[in-house]
């Protein structure tokens, strides 16, 4: 190569390098706006408890699409429905961030909510949809009505234990739907073991729970030298045994022809279509229970708080129940279409206090440009569900308040809130990752609300002087993913003289748990 040609070659390399570097820097300069972070840790120290409130406040300054650097990990926070829909409904944003301990080790990659976007997830999702879709969930209505009756009876008998009664109802309802198990107490060994699993999994998935999430090379450490790894592997073996035992008990009943409708039975009967092994089906059924029980009890708890804070909404729902159902019988799903305000109350409960106010995170698998902003591949994306559900542009200036009527039209029938999605809220998530059990959740909440408001009045508890006990409306308990209200007391009384007798009579017909 001559001196001249070498010079031209060197010049070409410099020009190409300049163009590439400029392009890369240009892309990163177009990152969405966000707060300045600290060296090394970036914005990590700014992401503390009640992140949804932090994101809402920062959104006032930085807008609907914000960028955070979390110790080198790009984090994109979304504060509007349009942006969330535009991004999270697309395949390239349907992955989940990798969680080495919670997903890879403790659940063997088979916990569907954490599973990466790929063929294994698609098979599990298809099987879950087959067992929980809108056209099949009506077979679970008798279970939901039965549990609602038991809850009404328990609240009338022991109102001071309402939290325990609500948690039992949620756990028993979902256990019956998933595994065809009869109503049980909250202390039932199966429920207790699965609840313990959910607690362990949630703690393992919390940011900062394990150093290996930030230093993946630690995964190569042999188990005998890494207690965190031994523990996770041990729990995977024990939890696999637990879920397989529950699943095989249903499989035995299916073989005998003695089973009732259940999600596990649907998996067994459709095994040839979706190609999952018994081990995979066992974990899928376990995941559906884990996701459903805690979120349902949290939603019921927020609704109880709303009834104390907004007595006019309670009275309007009761008036509708009196008109449609009367006082001689209990409400049923046959009344569903004729109770638009009660159904609106379901939607409003899930909008007003989403049990997961920041949603499960998504992950981008490719670079993307949105509205001129660069979103790098591998970014974690979070939708600020709390703020989106309270956006005044969609829900009005009173979006902070509980008002089921916002979901009704001028004739009192259910209507689509302008600018929102099908559910009139985004608490079930987005796109391919939308909650597959949302129809069960809606129906369970409908049964509970209709039954309780037919039978009882819910009021604030009083002190010895007759004054209402104070409530911490803004406080909450963060159980990992699920958020529930701080403990509070309620006053529960029969709504009319015959109500308690009718509930007790129905409970006797249903049997005890």
Curated annotation (Swiss-Prot):
Gene3D superfamilies documented for this protein: Cytochrome P450
Disulfide partners: none
Keyword Transmembrane: yes
Subcellular location: Membrane
Membrane topology, as annotated: Single-pass membrane protein
UniProt pathway: Secondary metabolite biosynthesis
Keywords per UniProt: Glycoprotein, Heme, Iron, Membrane, Metal-binding, Monooxygenase, Oxidoreductase, Transmembrane, Transmembrane helix
EC class name: oxidoreductase
Domain of life: Eukaryota
InterPro entries (alphabetical): Cyt_P450, Cyt_P450_CS, Cyt_P450_E_grp-I, Cyt_P450_sf, Cytochrome_P450_fung
Enzyme Commission no: 1.-.-.-
Major localization class: membrane
Biotech / industrial applications: Melleolide sesquiterpene aryl esters are cytotoxic secondary products with anti-cancer potential. Armillaridin shows therapeutic and radiosensitizing effects on human esophageal cancer cells. Armillaridin induces autophagy-associated cell death in human chronic myelogenous leukemia as well as of hepatocellular carcinoma cells. Armillaridin can also inhibit the differentiation and activation of human macrophages and thus might have potential to be developed as a biological response modifier for inflammatory diseases.
Cofactor(s) annotated in UniProt: heme
Pfam families: p450
Anything else known: Armillaria species are both devastating forest pathogens and some of the largest and oldest terrestrial organisms on Earth. They forage for hosts and achieve immense colony sizes via rhizomorphs, root-like multicellular structures of clonal dispersal. One genetic Armillaria gallica individual localized in Michigan's Upper Peninsula stands out as exceptionally large, covering hundreds of tree root systems over approximately 75 hectares of the forest floor. Based on observed growth rates of the fungus, the minimum age of this large individual can be estimated as 2500 years.
Described purpose of this protein according to its UniProt entry: Cytochrome P450 monooxygenase, part of the gene cluster that mediates the biosynthesis of melleolides, a range of antifungal and phytotoxic polyketide derivatives composed of an orsellinic acid (OA) moiety esterified to various sesquiterpene alcohols. The first step in melleolides biosynthesis is performed by the delta(6)-protoilludene synthase PRO1 which catalyzes the cyclization of farnesyl diphosphate to protoilludene. The orsellinic acid synthase armB produces OA by condensing acetyl-CoA with 3 malonyl-CoA units in a three-round chain elongation reaction folowed by a C2-C7 ring closure.
Name of protein: Cytochrome P450 monooxygenase ARMGADRAFT_1018418
Organism: Armillaria gallica (Bulbous honey fungus)
Lineage, top ranks: Eukaryota, Fungi, Dikarya, Basidiomycota, Agaricomycotina
């Amino acid at each position: 190569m001559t001196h001249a040609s070498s010079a031209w070659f060197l010049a070409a390399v410099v020009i190409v390098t300049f163009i590439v570097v400029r392009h890369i820097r240009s892309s990163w300069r177009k990152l969405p706006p966000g707060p300045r972070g600290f060296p090394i840790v970036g914005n990590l120290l700014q992401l503390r408890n009640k992140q949804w409130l932090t994101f809402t406040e920062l959104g006032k300054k930085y807008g609907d699409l914000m960028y955070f650097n979390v110790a080198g990990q790009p984090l994109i926070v979304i504060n509007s429905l349009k942006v969330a829909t535009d991004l999270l409904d697309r395949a390239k944003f349907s992955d989940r961030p990798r969680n080495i301990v919670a997903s890879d080790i403790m659940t063997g990659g088979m916990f569907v909510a954490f599973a990466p976007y790929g063929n294994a997830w698609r098979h599990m999702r298809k099987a879950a949809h087959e067992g929980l879709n809108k056209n099949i969930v009506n077979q679970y209505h008798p279970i939901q009505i039965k549990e609602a009756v038991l809850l009404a009876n328990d609240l009338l008998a022991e109102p001071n234990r309402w939290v325990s009664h609500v948690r039992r109802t949620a756990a028993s309802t979902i256990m019956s739907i998933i595994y065809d198990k009869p109503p049980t107490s909250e202390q039932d060994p199966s429920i207790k073991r699965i609840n313990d699993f959910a607690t362990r999994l949630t703690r393992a998935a919390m940011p900062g729970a394990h150093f290996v999430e930030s230093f993946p090379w630690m995964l190569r450490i042999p188990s005998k030298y890494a207690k965190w790894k031994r523990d996770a592997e041990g729990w995977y073996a024990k939890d696999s045994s637990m879920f397989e035992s529950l699943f095989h008990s249903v499989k035995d009943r299916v073989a005998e022809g003695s089973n009732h409708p259940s999600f596990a039975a649907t998996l067994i009967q459709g095994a040839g279509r979706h190609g999952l092994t018994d081990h995979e089906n066992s974990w899928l059924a376990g995941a559906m229970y884990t996701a459903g029980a805690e979120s349902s009890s949290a939603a019921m708890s927020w609704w109880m708080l709303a009834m104390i804070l907004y007595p006019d909404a309670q009275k309007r729902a009761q008036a509708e129940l009196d008109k449609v159902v009367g006082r001689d019988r209990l409400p049923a799903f046959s009344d569903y279409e004729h109770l638009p305000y009660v159904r609106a109350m379901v939607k409003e409960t899930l909008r007003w206090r989403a049990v997961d106010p920041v949603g499960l995170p998504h992950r981008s698998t490719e670079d993307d440009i949105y509205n001129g902003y660069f979103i790098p591949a591998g970014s974690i994306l979070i939708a600020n569900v709390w703020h989106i559900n309270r956006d005044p542009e969609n829900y009005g200036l009173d979006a902070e308040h509980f008002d089921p009527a916002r979901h009704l039209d001028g004739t009192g029938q259910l209507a689509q809130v302008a600018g929102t999605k099908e559910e009139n809220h985004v608490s079930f998530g987005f796109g391919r990752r939308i909650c597959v059990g949302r129809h069960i959740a809606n129906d369970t909440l409908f049964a509970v609300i209709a039954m309780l408001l037919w039978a009882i009045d819910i009021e604030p508890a009083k002190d010895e002087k007759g004054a209402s006990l104070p409530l911490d409306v803004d406080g909450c308990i963060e159980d990992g993913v699920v958020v529930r209200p701080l403990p509070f007391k309620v006053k529960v009384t029969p709504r009319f003289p015959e109500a308690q007798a009718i509930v007790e009579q129905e409970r006797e017909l249903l049997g005890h748990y």
